[in-house]
C-alpha cells in the first residue's frame, strides 16, 4: 500500500521542465507489466485475431463466389438475350420479306382485278353501243317501213276507185275459198 501511495505522492513532485532523459528504473517504467499484458494479448488475441481474419477471409471468398455466380448468371442471361435478339431479328426479317411478298401479291391482285373490271366495263360499253345501234337501226327500219306503207297506201288509195276496190275484194274472197277447198281435201 505504501508503494501505491508513494507513486501518487511522486506524481505530485514531477520535476519541472528540465530536459529529456531516459528512465532506467525498471519498476518505475513497468516493463514487466507491459510484457505480461502484451503476452496475454498475443496469446489470447492470436486466436481471436486469427478467427477474425478467417471470418473476413471466408466473407471475401463467399463474396467472390457470389460475384462469380452472379457474373455467370449475367453472362448466361446475356447469351439468352442475344439468342432471343437474333431470333427476333430473323423473325422481323422474315416478316419484312413476307410483308413485301404479300404487298407485291396484293399489288398484282389489285392490278389484275382492275384490269378485269376495266375489261368488263369495256364489254358492257361495247354491248351498250351495239344495243343502241340495233335500236337505232330498228327505229330507222320502222320509220322507213311506216313511210313506205303510208306511201303505198296513199298510192293505192289514190289509184283505187269503187269498182277496182270491189273486184279486189271479190278476188281475195275467191282466193280464200279455193284455199279452204284445198285444205278440206
UniProtKB/Swiss-Prot annotation:
Q: Listed GO molecular functions?
A: proton-transporting ATP synthase activity, rotational mechanism
Keyword Plastid in record: yes
Where does the sequence pass through the membrane?
27-49
Q: Where does the record place it?
A: Plastid, Chloroplast thylakoid membrane
**Is Transmembrane helix tagged as a keyword?**
yes
Note the topology in the membrane.
Single-pass membrane protein
Q: Which GO terms describe its cellular component?
A: chloroplast thylakoid membrane; proton-transporting ATP synthase complex
- List keywords of the entry alphabetically: ATP synthesis, CF(0), Chloroplast, Hydrogen ion transport, Ion transport, Membrane, Plastid, Thylakoid, Transmembrane, Transmembrane helix, Transport
Other information: In plastids the F-type ATPase is also known as CF(1)CF(0).
Q: Cite the HAMAP family for this sequence.
A: ATP_synth_b_bprime (MF_01398)
> Which protein are we looking at?
ATP synthase subunit b, chloroplastic
Gene symbol here is atpF
